[in-house]
Structure formats: C-alpha cells, structure tokens
From Swiss-Prot:
This is Protein archease. Belongs to the archease family. Pfam families: Archease. The keyword Amino-acid biosynthesis does not apply. The keyword ATP-binding does not apply.
C-alpha cells in the first residue's frame, strides 16, 4: 500500500525527561513511518520554511517495525548531519522487514533557526502500533 501524500500529517510532542518525544498517528505502517519522518523534521526546523529540492530512494530494513522506525529516522539524521539535507516527506511501501521509501526534502538554508538538535533516535518507550493508530518515538537531544 502506498502512503498518501494528501493526508493530514498528525503528531503531538510529548515531554520525556531531558529528551523529546512524539506520538504520531496513522492506520498503516506507511502512515506511521511517514508521519514520524515529518514530525522529527518539524522538531528540528520549521518545515514550512523549506523548499523541496531533493529526492532519493532507499530501502530500509529491520527485524521488526520498531527497528525499521529507528533505522529510518536515523538515516534522515545521517543525511542532515553529513550533507545538510533534511528529508521531511516520504512515500513508501512496507512489507515484512523492509520499507521501500522515496524521500523528499531540502538543503538546509544558511541562517535557518533550529528548533531542536536531535542527536539520536532511541528505543526508549518506542512503540509502532498501526492497529491502535499510533507510534511513539523518543529522541535524544
């Protein structure tokens, strides 16, 4: 199943000790993964100020949906830290242990204000539950 670009992206920020977390909503793995990418990017910068000018394709693997979530978001952080490109939108297909994803994003403009500097995605309190309509992710600041 393809994720739908026209859906309403929904997430809420949750406090977690000295870290920051999000709860993202969706009815499928694809929606949860997509909303998690957007939520993390929006925690980093105001995504509405970015102009989409980058696209890439990657297959993200993992033994569990939780592994895929951590690997996916860690990959987004890698591109931000290494190439100053923030991917904030994906379209994807998920099947057992594999997420085939197209990433869309932007080079980070000079002088843009960072909302948060996320160091890592954690397994702390991690949950990926499309059958219950949500995923919870905690980020190390």
């Amino acid at each position: 199943m393809d994720s739908d670009d026209n859906r309403t992206l929904s997430y809420e920020v949750v406090d977690h000790e000295s870290d920051i977390g999000v709860i993202v909503y969706g009815k499928t793995y694809e929606e949860l993964f997509s909303n998690a990418v957007y939520a993390m990017a929006d925690l980093i910068v105001d995504v509405s100020r970015l102009k989409e000018n980058r696209k890439m394709h990657e297959v993200i693997t993992g033994k569990t949906p939780e592994d895929i979530m951590v690997n996916l978001l860690s990959r987004v952080l890698f591109y931000l830290d290494t190439y100053y490109i923030l991917y904030y939108r994906i379209t994807s297909k998920y099947s057992d242990g594999e997420l085939d994803a197209y990433f869309y994003g932007s080079e980070i403009p000079e002088g843009i204000e960072y909302r948060n500097v996320i160091k890592a995605v954690t397994y702390s309190d991690l949950a990926v539950k499309p059958e219950e309509g949500y995923a919870k992710i905690i980020f190390d600041l």
